[in-house]
């Protein structure tokens, strides 16, 4: 009888991770114990993945509001700073904003509209249309914004982020001015010192600002890209990918993930004789069709993965084959024909009709989405995900 089960994704329960824990041992032991308890065999090319949160927690990669403030003060001189394009999030940005405000005399906060970079809306597109506002060209001050749109609350969180961010800045002792624009160069009419807080568009933003005459410009990826007073840091991403830990601190995106995943791969190989792929994952990069939010507030889906996860899928579209190449076949004859086609497929199907409709995403992004959806972001207690059969196809027995 042919095999009936394809890809399986399991969320594995793990201990609560604390700073200094040996995560390589914990992950390895969790996989081995789960295999025994649940009765599944370990195979070559299985995938084990860990949330970035437990990696950062084990590393103790944390920083305080005061650490952020000191770095901002050192880079901008403690004067006026234009803070542009932050995402609207209590978890992702509010604590960072407190640190930034404590390190400056005045904050000119420039928010993109109608939404932030990942789809959190201040207002709707319909409201822009109704008021005749052009988001590509119009720069609004706070008074004009309120006259046009009033006090809108986020539909999921119930927070008016304009009011919330304004209050945070004032609480930290800084003056605040708020404007709304989508061209980063608009901030230069208010200050030449700019901290751009966008994530995926940050390189373009920096280029535009540089060409327009910015005097001091750093990205959020350059704040806490080194340790301040013994704090955590991330040399590549700085504050990008950080989360609220407490009211006074953030957990930073993990660093040194490559040696970590390779150490787990080796330990599992020593224990099982199987070559298992290993990765660290953060946000899954999928988009909510209702809320329109893109689940990628992290700078990258996977900050570390083993070599076997490099690249993109190379797959045929079975529906296309069944409806076109083998439209006259059915039953076992159709099954045999499709299996034969899979076995003889080219090593690179890019641009070929038979691959049309397959997902052109990197393996780590696809698997990261699967892992994020499997582990969830709440109280499941499964920060380790074990995937089997991901690299199988219809011919695999």
Positions of PLM-derived features:
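Conserved mixed alpha/beta catalytic, RNA-binding, or beta-rich assembly cores of soluble enzyme
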Residues: 2-44, 53-397
């Amino acid at each position: 009888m042919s095999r009936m089960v394809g890809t399986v994704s399991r969320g594995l329960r793990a201990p609560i991770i604390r700073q200094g824990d040996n995560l390589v041992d914990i992950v390895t032991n969790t996989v081995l114990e789960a295999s025994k308890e649940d009765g599944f065999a370990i195979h070559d090319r299985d995938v084990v993945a860990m949330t970035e949160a437990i990696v950062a927690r084990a590393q103790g990669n944390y920083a305080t509001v005061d650490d952020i403030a000191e770095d901002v003060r050192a880079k901008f001189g403690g004067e006026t700073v234009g803070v542009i394009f932050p995402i609207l999030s209590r978890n992702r940005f509010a604590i960072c904003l407190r640190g930034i405000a404590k390190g400056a005399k005045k904050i000119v906060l420039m928010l993109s509209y109608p939404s932030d970079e990942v789809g959190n809306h201040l207002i709707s597109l319909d409201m822009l249309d109704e008021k005749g506002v052009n988001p590509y060209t119009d720069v609004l001050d706070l008074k004009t914004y309120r006259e046009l749109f009033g006090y809108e609350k986020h539909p999921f969180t119930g927070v008016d982020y304009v009011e919330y961010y304004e209050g945070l800045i004032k609480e930290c002792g800084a003056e605040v001015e708020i404007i709304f624009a989508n061209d980063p160069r608009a901030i230069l009419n208010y200050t030449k010192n700019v901290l751009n807080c966008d994530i995926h568009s940050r390189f373009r933003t920096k280029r535009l600002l540089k060409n327009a005459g910015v005097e001091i410009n750093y990205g959020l990826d350059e704040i806490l890209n080194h340790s301040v007073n013994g704090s955590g840091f991330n040399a590549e991403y700085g504050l990008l990918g950080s989360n609220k830990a407490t009211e006074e601190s953030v957990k930073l995106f993990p660093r040194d993930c490559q040696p970590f995943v390779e150490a787990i791969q080796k330990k599992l190989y020593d224990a099982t004789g199987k070559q298992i792929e290993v990765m660290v994952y953060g946000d899954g990069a999928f988009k909510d069709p209702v809320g329109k939010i893109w689940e990628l507030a992290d700078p990258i889906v996977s900050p570390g993965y083993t070599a076997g996860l490099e690249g993109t899928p190379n797959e045929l579209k079975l529906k296309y084959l069944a409806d076109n190449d083998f439209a006259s076949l059915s039953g076992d004859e159709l099954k045999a024909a499709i299996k034969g086609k899979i076995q003889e497929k080219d090593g690179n199907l890019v641009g070929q009709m038979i691959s049309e409709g397959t997902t052109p995403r990197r393996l780590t992004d696809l698997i990261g989405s699967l892992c994020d959806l499997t582990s969830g972001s709440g109280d499941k207690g499964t920060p380790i995900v074990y995937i089997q059969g991901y690299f199988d196809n219809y011919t695999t027995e």
